Amino acid sequence: MAAITAALVKELRERTGEGMMDCKKALEKAGGDIEKAIDDMRASGAIKAAKKAGNVAAEGAIAIKDDGKAAVLIEVNSQTDFLALQDDFKNFVAASVDKAFADKLTDAAPLIAAQEAAREALVAKVGENVNIRRLVRVEGDVVGTYLHGNKIGVAVVLKGGDVELAKDIAMHVAASNPEFLLPSQVSDEAIEREKAVFLQLNEEKIKGKPENIVENMVKGRISKFLAEASLVEQAFVKNPEIKVGELAKKGGAEIVSFTYFKVGEGIEKPVDNFAEEVAAQLAAAKQ
C-alpha cells in the first residue's frame, strides 16, 4: 500500500473537487492508488468525472511562432503571475520563441543554453526565478495555431485544407483539451476502466435486464466516452452540429496532429501554511 501523503490527497482533491477527508478516505480504501480511488468515487456516484492528472500551479506564459508551415511552442515559467505580466518577462519570452523558431530548434535544451545569460540577467533584475521549461516544433502541409491569454497554446497540423481551418481546430482544442486525436488511440485499459465504472454506477438500473440490453447500454456509454476523449469525434465548439473530424473533411483536410500547452501543467507549486507564514514574518520583524 502506497503512503497516503498530503500531496496525494491534494492531487485527488484537485482532480475531483471533493473534500479533503473524503479524498483521504478514498485513497485509504484504494490502497494509495489515485486512479482506483477516482474510479471508486465515480462508481459510488460521488463524482461524475475527474480532471486530467497533473498539479497545475506554476505561473508564466506560453509563446508561439508560426508561418503556416511550421510552428514552435514554448513555455517559460515564473514564480508569480505578477512577473508574467511585466514587460521584462514578456520581452525575454518573445526573444526566446523568436530564436527557437529562427534556429528551427526541436528541443528545449539548446534554447535554454542559448538564453542562459539573458535569463540570469532577468533573474538578477526581478529577484524571481525564471525558467524555460519546454519546447515543441511541428511542421506539415498546413499549420495553424491559437494562443489564449498567453496561458494556453495549441498548434494543429493538417494534410490539406488551409491555415484558417487549422486555426479554427486549434481554437477548439484550446477550449476542449482532448486527450487523443482518434478513438483508435484510446487504450483498451482506459475503455475497460470506463466500462467497469459504468456497470458499478448503474448496478441497480441494469439488474434483471437482458444481456443484450446491458451490452447496448455499455456500448452507448463507451461511444460517448470515445467522443469526449478524441478530437475528431468531438462536437465543434463553434458549431456543435458538426464533429471536428467532419469539419476537417469538409475543408478538404485530414488532422495529422495537435499539440496542447497549458502554463504550469504537471508542475506542483509548494503552498505555504498561511499561519506559519505570518508567524515567520512577525518573528523576522522582531529581529
Swiss-Prot record:
Record's keyword terms, sorted: Cytoplasm, Elongation factor, Protein biosynthesis
Main location, first listed in the record: cytoplasm
Gene Ontology MF term list: translation elongation factor activity
Subcellular location(s) per record: Cytoplasm
Involved in Mg(2+) ion dislocation from EF-Tu: region residues: 80-83
Pfam families referenced in this protein's UniProt entry, alphabetically: EF_TS
One GO CC term, this protein: cytoplasm
Coiled-coil region(s): none
Keyword Magnesium: no
Signal peptide segment: none
Family label: Belongs to the EF-Ts family.
Family annotation (NCBIfam families): tsf (TIGR00116)
Function, as annotated: Associates with the EF-Tu.GDP complex and induces the exchange of GDP to GTP. It remains bound to the aminoacyl-tRNA.EF-Tu.GTP complex up to the GTP hydrolysis stage on the ribosome.
Protein name: Elongation factor Ts
Organism: Pseudomonas fluorescens (strain Pf0-1)
